[in-house]
């Protein structure tokens, strides 16, 4: 073997990439040590035999792993054929190849035989560097063939194109392989040198070169290989082509084992691989990457540098769509540069030669293309077929048969049809379409076999019909399939595209429809991504791909006529079918604390909060359309007029609430749900009934999953900022931000309802409906200072706090201990420092619950709570008779005496009435001044601007209730008829026995600083002052 170039390879040590196995680490240390050792050629396997990475002098840029020698079987066949045909006579026997000339570990040099005495060898002991970038090496292989290679100094794969403009070109004529290379290549050496010292550009590299490249400014340099974008890059990469940039493929895998990353790299972001290994293995940008990924990419690059590129080349051509790529063809073409005589005698390659007998002929019309024109051709279709300009334009416009892949040119006189789905043209005879049927296709839609295979599913009416070719005869509008058989983790199901739901066929789920993610968990799939795990049974296509193709088909399909709107009867049947699905009702506790529609606590003289006498819901008169109501004592809501019939909202699963009838019989809706459906409105603005437009709601709204109740029932509304869906009533009760925008456009008032999800606005249980007007926004907090608002507010409470002496104060006793004196109890003893709440019990300590002791009092009859009352006056009378069974007084943990629960009180239950003397507002002001002068506590509760309840002298036990910023009770003004109102305390939450009852006094917050009353509730959200 004659070698004119030092074949020295130095592999650096990778200190940052640590391996877990200690034995592997030692082994790698032995092989990859950076001590300047020579890499013996006999350890490279077949590289010494001729499998050298890079392109030879024949200039085939597409071949990265070119095999110079023919297989042994082919060689034996060739020698036998020569001997039989007499072409080669007296051929000498093949000599046994000697081991390559290497430098041993002791530094000795093997001496060549005498027949190589005329060869010139480099001195192994002199590591002198040449200034030329290209060095020749001639390798004599085992089969006595000599092939010249030009291997650049930077990388082993950096070779050579005949023309600078065609550095990504494909095949060339074999007659011109050698005549232009020697002269033109050396003439362009100066042009390929970097323009600036230390920087490289795309013009310095060719297809197959190993490089270091970076895809972005903050990205690390990564091992990559330069490819020919016209033949080896996917279509998506070609569309994002960047001028004056090289197309590279990074080593390593980005996703699974077949996905790789591509990039267009400009000048300054690309360097030779071997020369810059030591520089780029210690990059600071690699701190954010996994060392294992960089280690694997680096090892794959070293393997490619040694010629092992079969897997890499397969992945690149597979991604580029070159399904007909054959590596043996390029190897055989390169062998033709060695010996034209052996080309004619190579029998096993004759079939391949016949297939590519004229590389410069157009694959479409077989027109001969000149060599100069072939070098400029850039339009190649998958399979490396050379096309002329007319055929390339036809290929771009999809004038190519989707079955036989033949181009539709002027020489083709066959009948063609075009698919209405993918817009691909197909020969009629390729799809076996007769001439008679071809005439019928002019009036209907046609779909190619690929589209029919992708969307081959069963329909509910007939399992033999094909969904993609199912077309409405009346208007040509495509019809969605009713159902599709899908499979996930071996479990079958029926997918309904219109509902986006699945019915499981496992046998235990029944006919219940489930969401795709829920059904995926039910099947036991571990992927947690139904878009890829759920597949169509017939075509084995992922459901997401099936949906995308279906959407594309619908977008491409052109309807000849506007689709006819379904009749009212059909829409009603469809709506009732949606509502017949099983669901879990949401049982809500409706209290009188706030309006069930707008959730405001305040009311006004012209818009009072009225309470239903049966279901106990509280609504504003204007919110419910009850402006004409005057008798508030016996008023019942619309749903409670017929208590024997249960009314439920058809737009949400929440039971109860402020319901209104619709124009569809037996269907009711919440006022809130109707407000937040753009298609629904009320026929009468004054009465707010009936709700019309229920049948106009899109069907897609009935199949959305509410993010709050996690159910599919009714119609969901959407967040104005994102695609989050929820029921309007669920969002209202969860404290979502909901707004009513009032606008005026062209002299007409426009109302728009807007809601926000939990991500865009933080939910708050005290949120109310915010009214946005051109003059500003109105909420409950902004209207606290409205003096016309009627409210249950304690307007005055004066309590003089005795100043407690300091604990460490020592008082001197002037008397002796023997003298008898009157015992004085200390008010603030050490035992009462913590101010614990102690209810007052007259029976001493007890070891049993109050309810258990109450059952022993058989002599005392405790009346049961009636289920219903005919009027509020009757309810109030019952409340007065039983108030001592519910509450008692005791020492408060907040201030002085307090009010305590004698038994468990449920949320929304009326506790007791706040009784006292009702006086005019002017009289209340005079009494308050008098109470202040004498230092007496005063308890004044305002019902309205004209009426105030004074419980200072003539009140009941309710006046002992203390203030808290987190109360468990609230006050509500009840009308008992004849323009008479009462104040009732109602439980805001469940109150346990012995727990202190508190209420928010709601003092006016605009008091002066000197009139501020400190708060002593010690609540986490304490406001520090009551006003």
From Swiss-Prot:
Name under which the protein is recorded: Histone-lysine N-methyltransferase ATX4
Sequence ranges of Basic and acidic residues compositional bias: 75-84
Family statement drawn from the similarity comment of this UniProt entry: Belongs to the class V-like SAM-binding methyltransferase superfamily. Histone-lysine methyltransferase family. TRX/MLL subfamily.
Organism: Arabidopsis thaliana (Mouse-ear cress)
Stretches annotated zinc finger (PHD-type): 704-761
Record keyword S-adenosyl-L-methionine present: yes
GO MF, one example: zinc ion binding
Region named Disordered: 75-104
Keyword Lipoprotein included in the entry's annotation: no
Highest classification ranks of the organism: Eukaryota, Viridiplantae, Streptophyta, Embryophyta, Tracheophyta
Top EC category: transferase
Function: Histone methyltransferase.
Pfam family, one: PHD_2
PANTHER family cross-referenced by the UniProt entry: HISTONE-LYSINE N-METHYLTRANSFERASE ATX4, PHD FINGER PROTEINS
């Amino acid at each position: 073997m004659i070698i004119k170039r030092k074949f020295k390879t130095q592999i650096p040590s990778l200190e940052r990439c640590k391996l877990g196995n200690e034995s592997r680490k030692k082994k790698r240390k032995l092989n990859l040590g950076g001590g300047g050792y020579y890499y013996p050629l006999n350890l490279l396997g077949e590289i010494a035999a001729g499998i050298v990475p890079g392109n030879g002098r024949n200039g085939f840029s597409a071949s990265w792993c070119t095999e110079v020698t023919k297989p042994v079987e082919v060689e034996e066949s060739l020698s036998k054929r020569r001997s039989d045909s007499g072409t080669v006579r007296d051929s000498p026997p093949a000599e046994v190849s000697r081991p390559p000339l290497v430098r041993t570990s002791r530094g000795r040099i093997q001496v060549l035989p005498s027949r190589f005495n005329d060869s010139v060898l480099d001195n192994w002991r002199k590591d002198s560097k040449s200034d030329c970038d290209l060095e020749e090496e001639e390798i004599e292989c085992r089969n006595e063939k000599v092939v010249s290679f030009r291997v650049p100094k930077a990388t082993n794969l950096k070779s050579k194109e005949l023309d600078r403009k065609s550095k990504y070109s494909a095949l060339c004529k074999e007659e011109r392989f050698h005549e232009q290379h020697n002269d033109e290549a050396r003439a362009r050496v100066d042009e390929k040198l970097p323009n600036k010292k230390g920087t490289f550009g795309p013009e310095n590299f060719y297809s197959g070169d190993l490089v270091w490249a970076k895809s972005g400014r903050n990205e690390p340099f990564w091992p990559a290989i330069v490819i020919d974008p016209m033949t080896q890059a996917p279509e998506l990469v070609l569309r994002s082509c960047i001028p004056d940039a090289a197309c590279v493929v990074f080593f390593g895998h980005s996703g699974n084992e077949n996905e790789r990353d591509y990039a267009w790299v400009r000048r300054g972001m690309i360097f030779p691989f071997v020369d810059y290994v030591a520089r780029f293995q210690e990059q600071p940008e690699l701190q954010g990457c996994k060392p294992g990924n960089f280690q694997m990419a680096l090892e794959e690059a070293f393997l490619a540098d040694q010629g092992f590129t079969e897997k890499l080349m397969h992945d690149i051509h597979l991604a580029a769509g070159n399904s007909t790529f054959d590596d043996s063809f390029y190897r055989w073409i390169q062998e033709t540069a060695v010996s034209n005589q052996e080309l004619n005698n190579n029998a096993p390659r004759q079939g391949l030669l016949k297939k590519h007998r004229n590389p410069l002929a157009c694959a479409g019309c077989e027109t001969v293309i000149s060599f100069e024109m072939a070098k400029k051709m850039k339009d190649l279709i998958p399979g490396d077929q050379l096309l002329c300009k007319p055929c390339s334009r036809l290929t771009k416009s999809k004038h190519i048969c989707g079955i036989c892949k033949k181009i539709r040119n002027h020489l083709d006189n066959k009948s063609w049809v075009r698919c209405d789905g993918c817009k691909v043209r197909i020969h009629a005879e390729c799809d076996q379409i007769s001439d008679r049927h071809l005439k019928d296709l002019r009036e209907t839609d046609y779909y190619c076999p690929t589209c029919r295979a992708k969307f081959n599913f069963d329909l509910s009416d007939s399992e033999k019909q094909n969904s993609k070719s199912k077309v409405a005869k009346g208007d040509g509008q495509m019809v969605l399939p009713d159902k599709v058989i899908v499979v996930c983790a071996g479990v079958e199901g029926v997918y309904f595209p219109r509902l986006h739901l699945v019915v499981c066929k496992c046998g235990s789920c029944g006919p219940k429809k489930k969401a795709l993610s829920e059904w995926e968990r039910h099947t036991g799939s571990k992927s947690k991504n139904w878009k890829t795990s759920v597949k169509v049974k017939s075509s084995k296509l992922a459901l997401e791909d099936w949906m995308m193709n279906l959407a594309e088909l619908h977008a491409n399909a052109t309807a000849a006529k506007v689709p006819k709107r379904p009749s009212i009867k059909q829409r009603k049947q469809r709506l009732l079918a949606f509502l017949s699905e099983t669901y879990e009702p949401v049982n809500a506790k409706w209290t009188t604390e706030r309006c069930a529609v707008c959730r405001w606590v305040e009311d006004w003289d012209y818009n009072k909060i009225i309470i239903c006498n049966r279901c106990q819901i509280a609504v504003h008169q204007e919110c419910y359309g009850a402006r004409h109501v005057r008798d508030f004592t016996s008023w019942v809501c619309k749903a409670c007029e017929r208590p024997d019939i249960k009314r439920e909202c058809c737009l949400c699963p929440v039971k109860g609430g402020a319901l209104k009838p619709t124009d569809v019989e037996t269907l009711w809706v919440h006022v809130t749900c109707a407000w937040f459906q753009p298609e629904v409105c009320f026929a009468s603005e004054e009465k707010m009934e009936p709700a019309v437009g229920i049948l106009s709601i899109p069907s897609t709204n009935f199949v959305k999953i509410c993010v709050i109740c996690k159910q599919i029932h009714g119609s969901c509304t959407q967040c104005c900022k994102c695609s989050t869906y929820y029921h309007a009533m669920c969002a209202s009760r969860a404290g979502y931000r909901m707004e009513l925008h009032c606008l005026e456009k062209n002299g007409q008032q426009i109302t728009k309802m807007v809601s926000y999800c939990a991500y865009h606005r933080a939910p708050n249980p005290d949120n109310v409906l915010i009214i946005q007007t051109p003059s500003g926004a109105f909420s409950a907090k902004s209207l606290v200072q409205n003096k016309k608002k009627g409210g249950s507010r304690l307007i005055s409470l004066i309590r003089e706090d005795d100043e407690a002496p300091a604990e460490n104060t020592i008082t001197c006793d002037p008397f002796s201990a023997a003298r008898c004196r009157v015992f004085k109890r200390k008010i603030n003893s050490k035992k009462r420092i913590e101010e614990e709440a102690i209810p007052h019990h007259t029976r001493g300590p007890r070891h049993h619950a109050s309810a258990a002791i109450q059952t022993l009092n058989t002599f005392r009859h405790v009346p049961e709570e009636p289920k219903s009352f005919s009027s509020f006056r009757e309810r109030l009378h019952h409340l007065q008779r039983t108030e001592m069974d519910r509450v008692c007084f005791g020492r408060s943990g907040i201030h002085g005496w307090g009010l305590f629960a004698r038994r468990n009180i449920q949320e929304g239950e009326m506790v007791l009435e706040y009784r006292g003397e009702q006086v005019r507002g002017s009289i209340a002001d005079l009494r308050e001044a008098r109470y202040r002068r004498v230092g007496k506590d005063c308890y004044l509760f305002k019902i309205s601007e004209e009426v105030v309840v004074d419980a200072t002298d003539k009140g009941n036990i309710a006046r002992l209730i203390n203030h808290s910023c987190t109360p468990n009770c609230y006050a509500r003004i009840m009308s008992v008829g004849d323009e008479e109102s009462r104040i009732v305390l109602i439980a805001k939450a469940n109150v346990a026995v012995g727990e202190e009852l508190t209420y928010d006094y709601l003092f006016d917050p605009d008091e002066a600083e000197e009139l501020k009353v400190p708060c002593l509730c010690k609540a986490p959200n304490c406001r520090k002052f009551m006003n």
